[in-house]
């Protein structure tokens, strides 16, 4: 049985649509509606955000609020590192997916010699960089930062010196980089990405499992093949963006995409992954109740969260 600690990160400085900072409270409301004591059952820590930057002018159009994201890396990584060092299992509930870069940094700071595998359950690859981004939103870049990639081969923008320096700081955060090797990343239900991201996926032959492949093979076989693929890794981090779910049930997120996972498919996948003892951290992210109807997205997220943690408790 693992000791669980919840890390709440209500930060949305990396998102393009407002409201993801309210996702954690929406999940807590869902827990109350289900009459669950989940959120009083485990120790928790709430991370102070940089959301005040949302009211200030944007200085880097190709890396919006990157200074705030860098500060969040500092705060999130410290919380994750300390949690692991104290022999707790960090369950991170975050606003937008840029926070995952801080989570990855925290794992590596706690376990600098680990070979970290990442299971990225997301409709998007999040492999953009300030040089390639179509939006400038930092939640589209955490995976590129983790593998310390600029992707200058696909460059669309010229960066000012300050933005370039901040991006370098983000990639090199904690003085460990790359934090993850591209071949140790598995994308699940990836289905919405740009040619610049496709270039990196093909360059590094990164593993992608589509929704169709999952349905053909079934969750059991997919989990087995993913864990076999990551067998050289000493630790595994699972990052669950709710937009990996089909848009019919993921209205309450900033970037819903059709042809995604059904709730049961996602639950089965995550809970089966969680049975593996190499899994050292789980994150769920991008719930945005301002876009939702009757808190459905948060209810689904809570069900996945609760089932995953139940598996950890039994391990």
Language-model region placement:
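Conserved alpha-helical scaffold segments that buttress catalytic/binding sites
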Residues: 2-315
């Amino acid at each position: 049985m693992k000791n669980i600690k919840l890390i709440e990160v209500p930060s949305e400085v990396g998102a393009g649509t407002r409201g993801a900072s309210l996702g954690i409270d929406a999940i807590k409301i869902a827990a109350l509606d289900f009459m669950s004591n989940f959120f009083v059952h485990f120790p928790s820590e709430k991370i102070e955000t940089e959301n005040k930057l949302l009211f200030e002018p944007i200085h880097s159009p190709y890396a919006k609020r990157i200074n705030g994201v860098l500060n969040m890396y500092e705060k999130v990584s410290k919380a994750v590192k300390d949690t692991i060092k104290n022999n707790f299992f960090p369950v991170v509930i975050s606003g937008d997916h840029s926070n995952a870069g801080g989570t990855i940094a925290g794992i590596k700071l706690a376990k600098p010699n680990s070979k970290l595998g990442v299971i990225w359950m997301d409709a998007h690859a999040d492999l953009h960089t300030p040089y390639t981004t179509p939006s400038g939103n930092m939640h589209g870049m955490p995976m590129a930062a983790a593998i310390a990639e600029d992707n200058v081969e696909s460059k669309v923008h010229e960066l000012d010196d300050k933005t370039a320096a901040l991006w370098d700081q983000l990639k090199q955060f904690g003085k460990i980089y790359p934090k993850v090797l591209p071949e140790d990343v598995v994308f699940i239900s990836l289905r919405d990405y740009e040619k610049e991201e496709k270039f990196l996926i093909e360059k590094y032959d990164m593993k992608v499992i589509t929704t169709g492949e999952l349905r053909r093979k079934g969750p059991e076989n997919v989990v087995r093949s993913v864990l076999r693929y990551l067998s050289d890794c000493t630790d595994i981090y699972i990052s669950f963006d709710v937009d990996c779910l089909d848009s019919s049930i993921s209205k309450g997120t900033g970037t819903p995409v059709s042809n995604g996972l059904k709730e049961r498919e996602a639950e089965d996948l995550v809970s089966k992954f969680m049975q593996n003892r190499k899994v050292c951290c789980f994150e769920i992210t991008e719930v945005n109740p301002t876009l939702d109807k009757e808190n459905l997205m948060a209810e689904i997220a809570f069900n996945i969260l609760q089932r995953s943690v139940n598996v950890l408790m039994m391990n």
